[in-house]
Amino acid sequence: MELKTKESGLKFAVIVEGAGPQPAAADTVLMHYEIWVGEGVTSSNYDHGNEVYVDFLYDSTYDEENPFNGPVEIIIGAETPKDEVYQRGQSIAGLDEALLEMKVGGKVALDIPPHLAYGEEGASSFHTFHGYRTPPHMSIRCNIELVEIKPELEHKKEIPDSGPAYEAV
């Protein structure tokens, strides 16, 4: 599958074309994801010859053993989560850009460059793989599936009272 590079640097390929509605900025959506560690990462569990992780799946909402399995809820355009407490709905710019071009039922492959992910700072211990924080300058490779767009009134009513979805360990 060939990824096309967008002007922003996001690499994008359609796996399944969706047939449902298309979300807009500030919409709350439910999505599945599978995330692979991208370039810019080193640790004790990597390809020593190339000094990078290669095709290492580190998080998936399809994983039945993951306590947070099932589709996750994000608000397109919400602040990038970088602190110790993830607030329900937070997203990253690369996901937002892709979601705005998708339709419900669609699935895409992405290669999100660092400036559209967690950038120069990286992210807190919440966003981890094998107990390490998401490091600075890390790209993210993922597949995402747009499951549902939540009705506008429903998410506007829910989010102010939602509080933290879960905290870093």
Language-model region placement:
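Cross-family detector of peptidyl-prolyl cis-trans isomerase
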Residues: 1-169
